[in-house]
């Protein structure tokens, strides 16, 4: 089972991306939101689920573990396969999906192509009590991964700009300790500013 893929983004299409890892190009199906965060030629990491059928092996990729877990949870509902689960996550982001299921919001769920009123009712009945548990465990795991991923990206960017790895790591750790919620771009600018003062 392939749990995640990390490498250079070779291609981005409407419904998938190709990511090269260890010389192999993996085609990973993903939602528009996930694909929108990728950039051709840049490194990316996606959490993946592999669906194996008699005639195919398909990878589905997600930017966080919460989306990945919701994708798996959706497929426990009778009549929901990988395509419909992906369509659901394409229309409803994790928070909106959790709310719709918890509150029994059939209108929100039926906005997904392929989900009618009966299907939406079935989803609510089967998932209402399970969806919060997924969010709690996935949220905790996701935070740790995102934090380390941001750190790695900043250190690599600073190394690419010619800073020694030790200095890059110290500056990055200092910035993230002071502003743990900072985005990658903000943290990178702060680290560059810090390194500029010490040069």
UniProtKB/Swiss-Prot annotation:
Its main location: cytoplasm. GO terms for molecular function: ATP binding; four-way junction DNA binding; four-way junction helicase activity. Residues 1-63 are annotated as: Domain I. It is found in: Cytoplasm. One of its GO terms (biological process) is DNA repair. The keyword Nucleotide-binding does not apply. Residues 64-141 are annotated as: Domain II. GO terms for cellular component: cytoplasm; Holliday junction helicase complex; Holliday junction resolvase complex. Residues 146-199 are annotated as: Domain III. Residues 141-145 are annotated as: Flexible linker. The RuvA-RuvB-RuvC complex processes Holliday junction (HJ) DNA during genetic recombination and DNA repair, while the RuvA-RuvB complex plays an important role in the rescue of blocked DNA replication forks via replication fork reversal (RFR). RuvA specifically binds to HJ cruciform DNA, conferring on it an open structure. The RuvB hexamer acts as an ATP-dependent pump, pulling dsDNA into and through the RuvAB complex. HJ branch migration allows RuvC to scan DNA until it finds its consensus sequence, where it cleaves and resolves the cruciform DNA. Belongs to the RuvA family. Homotetramer. Forms an RuvA(8)-RuvB(12)-Holliday junction (HJ) complex. HJ DNA is sandwiched between 2 RuvA tetramers; dsDNA enters through RuvA and exits via RuvB. An RuvB hexamer assembles on each DNA strand where it exits the tetramer. Each RuvB hexamer is contacted by two RuvA subunits (via domain III) on 2 adjacent RuvB subunits; this complex drives branch migration. In the full resolvosome a probable DNA-RuvA(4)-RuvB(12)-RuvC(2) complex forms which resolves the HJ. This is Holliday junction branch migration complex subunit RuvA. The lineage of its organism: Bacteria, Bacillati, Actinomycetota, Actinomycetes, Mycobacteriales. The gene is ruvA.
